[in-house]
């Protein structure tokens, strides 16, 4: 695949309308996420021809360019540097097309027409900003925990292990314990920042959920208070409560800042915000967040244990990826981790990627030997097997529509199997909140009966997704489809 170079970034910037059209440049694991002043100035046909670009996703809030893992972050850093140099006058920017009045009118009409959808997409897109920086840590902690559990089951249980082995296992587990002990604080920081507030205020509010309020407790950090002016404190809600506190806290902070004199902003804005939000958190958010958290856990535990529900979740997941709203599942992952000790939704959703691989392989065998389609599949199938599905989605199946549908069917079949096994008494899941998909996720799988049953069920589900995705596409997804 093409590398991200300064020339690539320069071409991308020019194709989206220049630095003056880019309000914000960020990234997630695989996408360069741009907030454009006018989406009408971005030329998608030009962007798709730039080496390294796998596809484009456009919404009212963000213009997303799919580049692949690693490359998205590199491109975002280079583009921000280029924009800074252009705006400071260090370089000359190529001439950009003048903003057409009709284009502006069309853009405004589009935004007004889809205002509700845009609001939902804007809200869910914030989750990418909150959780994407944490994903490498989730993966690292999950892998270390997986290896530690593997060593434990092979060399410790029913044996007399050496002290070195015990120390090694404890050492590999400590990172996961550290991550989950203070994860709420990291999320609070990112969440309040994502919604327009100060990250440190979000971290402080999140710490209210981490502190202990029982002076007799022998673990945790006692907060120094066991009630709030006569009201009992029950730090429930976990991630849901933290997100609510940070989101509302950001709005309160912005309102306070509007009326605060500039000279007093640094001193008083955070003080007032914390005093208000502390009370709101103790009295309202913790009780409500706790009930929402409990309800979400119950809903998805029942869906995951239901073969039909699991099939629907897996079958629709690719569609949520296309619309960029799949990050909305992340709070559910936290709820399941709290309720079960592992993330039972993740392996179900991962089946969608298996269906994608199977569908793409069917297209490969249906296409002629010299077809460009075969080259496209060859370049995207390895990332697909490793859990990076976007090259297959945007480069192979989605442009041809029918194979995308049959890929969803393949994913639904794998999801049905995972749900059926769970219904029969063996729920499986990821040993961390978030992790890689595809075959890379195998070492991270676990179950109530240990890691080996979890790994075997996940592999069987993937194979079913591959096979059903392949057969559905081979026999039903290639008619009247461009295979050139």
Curated annotation (Swiss-Prot):
EC number(s) recorded for this UniProt protein: 2.7.1.192
Top-rank taxon, per record: Bacteria
Compartmental location: Cell inner membrane
Pfam families per record: PTS_EIIB, PTS_EIIC
GO biological process, one term: phosphoenolpyruvate-dependent sugar phosphotransferase system
Assigned keywords, A-Z: Cell inner membrane, Cell membrane, Kinase, Membrane, Phosphotransferase system, Sugar transport, Transferase, Transmembrane, Transmembrane helix, Transport
Cellular compartments per GO CC: plasma membrane
Residues that span the membrane, as ranges: 127-147, 168-188, 194-214, 228-248, 266-286, 310-330, 345-365, 379-399, 409-429, 451-471
Domain PTS EIIB type-1: 1-89
PTS EIIC type-1 domain boundaries: 125-484
Catalytic residues in the record: 28
Protein's membrane topology: Multi-pass membrane protein
NCBIfam families from the UniProt entry: PRK09586.1
Domain notes: The EIIB domain is phosphorylated by phospho-EIIA on a cysteinyl or histidyl residue, depending on the transported sugar. Then, it transfers the phosphoryl group to the sugar substrate concomitantly with the sugar uptake processed by the EIIC domain.
Function: The phosphoenolpyruvate-dependent sugar phosphotransferase system (sugar PTS), a major carbohydrate active transport system, catalyzes the phosphorylation of incoming sugar substrates concomitantly with their translocation across the cell membrane. This system is involved in N-acetylmuramic acid (MurNAc) transport, yielding cytoplasmic MurNAc-6-P. Is also able to take up anhydro-N-acetylmuramic acid (anhMurNAc), but cannot phosphorylate the carbon 6, probably because of the 1,6-anhydro ring.
Name of the protein: PTS system N-acetylmuramic acid-specific EIIBC component
Designated gene of the protein: murP
